[in-house]
């Protein structure tokens, strides 16, 4: 009987050790929220952001990464992007779940510049690769750091880089 108890205790300890060392799959909790976030960007469904983001959502976009701290500013950013690029689309290429509070997404964005934005519409299509680090807490998105090549994007729209010494002549 003593051997059975010792053997059972040993098996229980080994089982607990293996279970506690297993990496948790955060994707099952986070993927549905990410899919709704992508819906906001890809379809312009801004109301869904009320459900999945915190009021003080912090958006940081290159090159300055200056914080825009509010859900309303996020909605404005998405709305302005979709106004300038009505067919704007984010395609997720890869997801790396860091923890239950952060995921890194590698993506490709595409869009045709048909609407007014920071410049008159060019009618040209552009695409760029980039990545986002998206942060979570208690089942809601709390922020995103977003990076891509602005230069790649604007060159595809037909903009040219002019060195300062040429502009001065």
Where are these predicted regions, by residue range?
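A short acidic/glycine-rich loop-to-helix N-cap element
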Residues: 24-25, 118-123, 152-160
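Exposed beta-sheet edge and beta->alpha loop/turn motif
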Residues: 108-141
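A short, structured loop/turn motif at beta-sheet edges
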Residues: 95-103, 135-142
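A solvent-exposed, acidic/Ser-Thr-rich amphipathic alpha-helical stretch
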Residues: 46-99
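Bacterial Sec-dependent N-terminal signal peptides
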Residues: 1-28
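Low-complexity, intrinsically disordered terminal/linker segments enriched in charged
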Residues: 142-169
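A mature extracytoplasmic/lumenal domain signature
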Residues: 63, 108-111, 148
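Short, low-complexity N-terminal intrinsically disordered segments enriched in polar/charged residues
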Residues: 20-55, 164-169
């Amino acid at each position: 009987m003593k051997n059975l108890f010792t053997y059972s205790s040993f098996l229980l300890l080994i089982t607990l050790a293996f279970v506690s060392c297993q990496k948790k799959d955060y994707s099952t909790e986070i993927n549905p929220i990410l899919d709704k976030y992508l819906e906001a960007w890809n379809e312009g469904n801004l109301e869904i952001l009320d459900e999945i983001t915190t009021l003080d959502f912090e958006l940081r976009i290159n090159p300055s990464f200056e914080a825009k701290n509010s859900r309303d500013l996020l909605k404005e950013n998405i709305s302005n992007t979709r106004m300038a690029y009505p067919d704007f689309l984010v395609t997720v290429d890869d997801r790396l779940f860091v923890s239950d509070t952060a995921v890194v997404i590698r993506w490709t964005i595409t869009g045709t510049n048909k609407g007014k934005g920071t410049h008159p519409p060019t009618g040209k299509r552009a695409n760029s690769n980039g990545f986002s680090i998206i942060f979570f807490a208690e089942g809601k998105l709390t922020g995103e750091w977003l990076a891509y090549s602005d230069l790649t994007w604007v060159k595809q729209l037909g903009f040219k880089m002019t060195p300062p010494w040429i502009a001065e002549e």
